[in-house]
Amino acid sequence: KVLSSEQRSRYDKAKKSDEPVMIVTPEEALENEKKKAKGTKTWVFQAENVRDFGFASSRKFIWDAQGVTFGNRTVMAMSYYPKEGNPLWEKYSTRVVAHTLKTYSHYTFPYPYPVAISVHANSIGMEYPMICFNGGRPESDGTYTARTKYGMISVIIHEVGHNYFPMIVNSDERQWTWMDE
């Protein structure tokens, strides 16, 4: 069993929520960080119509999510981040993912995948279908500058946007960089 029944219940609640819901709380992530896993957990990933893939795993991850409705479909906008990403990530990441999906879908075509995930990375931005790794971290005391905040928001918008170009459209980002960056 990968998620506890309580976490599964939160996930189901997040599907219907227009605000992020904690799936793995900061307290649960802290407990996970303190102890080693007993046994194994198996996650099975399957994706259609993707040209690349990426995934992230850490017992330190806090996980929040919210549903984004496109007609009769719900796409899950989600974020995974360690405690070092807060308060910035909890406040902004998933909301920015959801907003980006709505905006790109309005101006191009509906987002076809079931999830869009933003993963905290210390200082990079990199995209794969349905998942992107984004920088932006507050200082160790939890404070952050406007530059850090808007830099994080900008890189999330940019990397989630790469789901459309080049991932879904399947443009060649090396040949047509003007479409990519």
Predicted features, each with a name:
Residues 160-176:
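Catalytic Zn2+-binding segment of zinc metalloproteases
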Residues 1-157:
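Hydrophobic helix-coil surface modules that form long, contiguous segments used
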Residues 15, 158, 177-181:
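Short, intrinsically disordered, charge-balanced linker/junction segments flanking boundaries
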Residues 115, 167, 180-181:
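Glycine-rich, histidine-containing beta strand-loop boundary motifs that form or position
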Residues 93-94, 173-181:
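Active-site metal-coordination segments of metallo-dependent hydrolases
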